[in-house]
Swiss-Prot record:
Source organism of the structure: Mus musculus (Mouse)
GO terms (BP aspect): mitochondrial translation; translation
Record's keyword annotation contains Transmembrane helix: no
GO CC, alphabetical: mitochondrial inner membrane; mitochondrial large ribosomal subunit; mitochondrion
GO MF term list: rRNA binding; structural constituent of ribosome
Organism superkingdom: Eukaryota
Subcellular location: Mitochondrion
Any coiled-coil regions, as ranges: none
Pfam families: Ribosomal_L16 (PF00252)
Name of the protein: Large ribosomal subunit protein uL16m
InterPro entries: Ribosomal_uL16, Ribosomal_uL16_bact-type, Ribosomal_uL16_dom, Ribosomal_uL16_sf
Lineage: Eukaryota, Metazoa, Chordata, Craniata, Vertebrata
Gene3D superfamilies named in the record: Ribosomal protein L10e/L16 (3.90.1170.10)
Disulfide cross-links: none
UniProt keyword Ribonucleoprotein, yes or no: yes
Amino acid sequence: MWRLLTRVPAPLLRMHFSDSWAALPTSAGLKTLLPVPTFENVSIPERSKLKFVERVPLVPKVRREPKNLKDIRGPSTEATDFTEGNFAILALGGGYLHWGHFEMMRLTINRFMDPKNMFAIWRVPAPFKPITRKGVGQRMGGGKGAIDHYVTPVKTGCLVVEMGGRCEFEEVKGILNQVAHKLPFPAKAVSRKTLERMHQNQRERELNNQNPWTFEHIATANMFGIRKFLSPYDLTQKGRYWGKFYMPKRV
């Protein structure tokens, strides 16, 4: 045994296992590394950080309006695709963004990002929808209350913030998810590839669906008289949206 130990080569790796030391010989192997991205076609704007958002719209007079819950219901038709960046926060439900949410996103992302190699832009407008509120202890009646604050309505599928630059998705995924968890609606960090993969998976589920009893088939055939409990909106959206909530598993 001692003769075998004398033949051990000089360069050894020593590792500590509990109360004893074990000597391991060095080993070499083939390594395949991914090519390093060059970011040759990426241009950084002069003002790369998120801009400050006004708390009140700069208009002479704002009219009070009803709730209009249709502003947060259903799929979004604006800001659904990338424009300049490659990463963004995708809204998975409807809701209202207050001025505090804009400040939270601006301060968190600007503190993290490198302005020389990254940039971020808003994809949603500043708060413009007035929300009225009456004081505590005030009697009912007397007309609509005074304007208390302003919000920005967001629908499902809307990109809230967009980021890009000389960086990869794994570098910004953590900070984007941290911001997404603090929003008043479900959201997640996505990239161009992950967003396209989500749309592709949804199309494949619709084409390869083997269950004939879909919501569209049941509602169209008026089974058990279900049409009297549905609205025209349920027929156009095929039951995938319930108010501001989105049900992605429904085909």
